[in-house]
Amino acid sequence: MDLRKKIRIVENFPIEGISFKDVTPILKDPKAMKHTTKEIAKYLEDKNVDVVVGPEARGFLFGVPVAHELDIGFVPVRKPGKLPYKTFSVDYALEYGSDSLEIHSDGIEKGQNVAIVDDLLATGGTVLGVSKLVEKLGGHVSALNFVIELTELKGRDKLKGYDIQSLVKYDL
């Protein structure tokens, strides 16, 4: 299946000059969603992954089905103040400024192999922050999996040393 045909391009969203890659048509199409889930799960089959981690919000949409396909658990990573139990946090750099992410303190067990699943790899800042959280808890990041990669933003450069999968690549 050509997933590129299922990704809607919305020009000038959320601001002028941005060409937004909208994954909601994949979510709406059960065959496209199943294909996406199976492609990521197939990539992870030989990586001995114990748990899938996904950043809010679209990481939840793809991470949970992948975890179910692999018959393993899912751990959410959220913005500060959104998780009800004790958390660990990390600050990470954005293109202009910084942000924070949190994970439950018991979300990852020491030595667990973790796949981080998200919809989009752009600059790599968010997933690098998520990776640091996983590693802070003693987990090993086995793979970073994305539906879309915006290659010109060079997120891969920031993620050297990690095993990266992206299903669809766009040059800006």
UniProtKB/Swiss-Prot annotation:
Gene3D superfamilies: 3.40.50.2020. It is found in: Cytoplasm. It comes from the Archaea. InterPro entries: Ade_phspho_trans, PRibTrfase_dom, PRTase-like, UPRTase/APRTase. It holds the Pfam family Pribosyltran. It is an enzyme of class 2 (transferase). GO terms for molecular function: adenine binding; adenine phosphoribosyltransferase activity; AMP binding. Its EC number is 2.4.2.7. SUPFAM superfamilies: PRTase-like (SSF53271). GO terms for cellular component: cytoplasm. Keywords: Cytoplasm, Glycosyltransferase, Purine salvage, Transferase. Its main location: cytoplasm. Pathway: Purine metabolism; AMP biosynthesis via salvage pathway; AMP from adenine: step 1/1. It catalyses: AMP + diphosphate = 5-phospho-alpha-D-ribose 1-diphosphate + adenine. One of its GO terms (biological process) is purine ribonucleoside salvage. Belongs to the purine/pyrimidine phosphoribosyltransferase family. Catalyzes a salvage reaction resulting in the formation of AMP, that is energically less costly than de novo synthesis. Homodimer. This is Adenine phosphoribosyltransferase.
